[in-house]
Structure formats: C-alpha cells, structure tokens
C-alpha cells in the first residue's frame, strides 16, 4: 500500500508538469514569431512635491528577419513593462524593406535629428558590418550582408531612427527602372539577375 501511494504521487507530479508544459507552450511560441532587440534602456526621474518618481524608457526593434521591421519606444515604471510597450509600439510601425538576397538593392543614406547612417550593399558572406544600434535594425529586418557607417551623432536613439530612415529610402530595381524608363537589366545589380536566373526571388 505505501508503494502504491508513492506511485500515485509520482503520477500526479508528472501530470502537473505536463499541465505546466502545455500552459507555457503558447506564449513561448508567440515570442519566437518575431526577433526582438532592446537597443537602449534609460531611467527617467520626475520631480514632484513628495520627491522624485522614477520610470524607465526602452527603445525596442522588432522584426520577422524576413524583410519586415519596426521600431518602438515604451515608457513604464518597470523595465519589463517598458520593453513590452516598446514591442507593441514597434509592431504598429512595421514596414517592408526591399532586399536582394541577403543584402540591400543600392547604397542609401538616412538622417534623423543629428544621426546620419550610410548603408552599402555587400557580397554574400560579408556579414553585418555595423555597430550595435544599426546591427539590431538590420538583423531584425533580415539583412545579413551589408556595410554601414555612422556619420553623425553617437546617440543610439538617433542612430536607430536614421537607420530606419535609410531603409525606408530603399527602392526596388523595378521601381527605379519604371521611374527612369529603362529596362530592368540596365538598373538591376548582377546579383539580382543571377538570383532570378537561379529561381531565387529578389
């Protein structure tokens, strides 16, 4: 009899573990749907009659690593809450990034406040040659081969928004060809033409 009680207790423990696994599976799967990068967290103090009240701000970059990215800014009394608000804000500002394979179609420069960021296409295998804030945006957008240089402010917030401005300024070769009235072969980079010939969409 005592042995049966111990077996029953073990079974109940496994049932509880299974229930915890099932209940925790949903949120874990949802979190992996997007790539999230926290670029900066700042503490903000507000002086009131009774003293100072502290809150936190978080700059977050969210993307699907497949051409979609967004940036959000969250503020709350606790760091996790600020990050969560930043993630939700970033998802509201998603936009598509034109890509050719694993790089960008053409060189582009973005400016925001005092931040200036220059992006250049790179050959496969180069990797993301960029600093932390720029790298966060590019990795979330799914750009894996690119050269970058920050020409302005070193403020992470300005750099992130300048990078977003640069990505928003990218144009697909089809758009450039239509605007100039030229055939696609005259404006598309060789890498894109080779990829299309191999059956890989740009």
Curated annotation (Swiss-Prot):
Residues 1-31 are annotated as: Disordered. Coiled coil: none annotated. Residues 34-97 form the S5 DRBM domain. InterPro entries: Ribosomal_Su5_D2-typ_SF (IPR020568), Ribosomal_uS5 (IPR000851), Ribosomal_uS5_bac-type (IPR005712), Ribosomal_uS5_C (IPR005324), Ribosomal_uS5_N (IPR013810), Ribosomal_uS5_N_CS (IPR018192), Ribsml_uS5_D2-typ_fold_subgr (IPR014721). Disulfide bonds: none annotated. One of its GO terms (biological process) is translation. Pfam families: Ribosomal_S5, Ribosomal_S5_C. GO terms for cellular component: small ribosomal subunit. Residues 14-23 have a biased composition (Basic and acidic residues). Keywords: Ribonucleoprotein, Ribosomal protein, RNA-binding, rRNA-binding. GO terms for molecular function: rRNA binding; structural constituent of ribosome. Residues 1-13 have a biased composition (Gly residues). PROSITE patterns: RIBOSOMAL_S5, S5_DSRBD. Part of the 30S ribosomal subunit. Contacts proteins S4 and S8. The N-terminal domain interacts with the head of the 30S subunit; the C-terminal domain interacts with the body and contacts protein S4. The interaction surface between S4 and S5 is involved in control of translational fidelity. With S4 and S12 plays an important role in translational accuracy. Belongs to the universal ribosomal protein uS5 family. This is Small ribosomal subunit protein uS5. It comes from Parafrankia sp. (strain EAN1pec).
